[in-house]
Every structure is written in structure tokens, then in C-alpha cells.
Amino acid sequence: MTELVLRSDKDGVATLTLNRPDALNALSPALFVELRAHVESIAGDVENVGCVVLRGAGRSFCAGNDLKSIQEGQEAPSPTYQADTVDMIEALPQPVIAEVRGHCYTGGLELALCCDLLMAS
């Protein structure tokens, strides 16, 4: 099974990559579960992680919420799971940089705007 959010750490920088390039990194409930797990891990690791970069794999940052997963009946663990995860990113003690390239719609824009710095191309 493909990881929906990849994490790589180098020189104190944790890079989180939304990893659904074939779907333009659309946000499914499963992706948010993985994203939150990484965010929780990073929040507790201020000794080793000094900065976070949030990016999308492929040609798009994020095309927004995955409407197909909603139509298929996939549900988040709670009604506020996505919003709570965005709030957790905003509250991280480390600065978070959104590396935005390509599409950045709806939920993807929420992700970008919760970061401390947004770099777009």
C-alpha cells in the first residue's frame, strides 16, 4: 500500500509530502489520518525538528477534498477531524512552510493558509 503522506527528515527539517499525485493530492479521510499522525509526531519532537515543509508530490500541491472518497462513503474519524488537523498544523511549535506548486483548491488552500509561510510557484 502506498503511503499517502511521506515524511523525510534532514538537518532538522521535516518534509511532509502529500503523496497522491495521480489524484492531484486530493484530500481523502485516509490521507488526513496519516497527516495527523505525522503532525503529532513532529509536535513532540522539538529537539530534532526545527522546521516543517509541507508539499505535494507531482505537479500539484493539492486539488482539495477528494469527492470520490466522499461518494464512496469514506468518513473521517470525527466530523471535525480535518479542521482539527489543520488547527494542529497551525499550532505546531516549529515554523511550517507550505511549498505550493500547481493546483491549490478548497481543503488544499486551507492547508497552505494554516502554515506560517507560503511559497508558491
Give the location of each predicted region.
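Hydrophobic alpha-helical membrane-association signature
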Residues: 31-35, 81, 111
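Conserved CoA-thioester-binding segment of acyl-CoA-metabolizing enzymes
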Residues: 1-57
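Glycine-rich beta-to-alpha active-site loop
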Residues: 88-121
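Glycine- (often His-adjacent) and acidic-residue-rich active-site loop
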Residues: 48, 56-88, 104
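Phosphate-coordinating loops and pocket residues in cytosolic domains that bind phosphorylated ligands
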Residues: 26-29, 63, 72, 114
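Histidine-centered beta-alpha loop that forms part of the nucleotide-sugar donor binding/catalytic region
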Residues: 19, 65, 101
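Hydrophobic/aromatic residues within transmembrane alpha-helices
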Residues: 16, 54, 66, 111-113
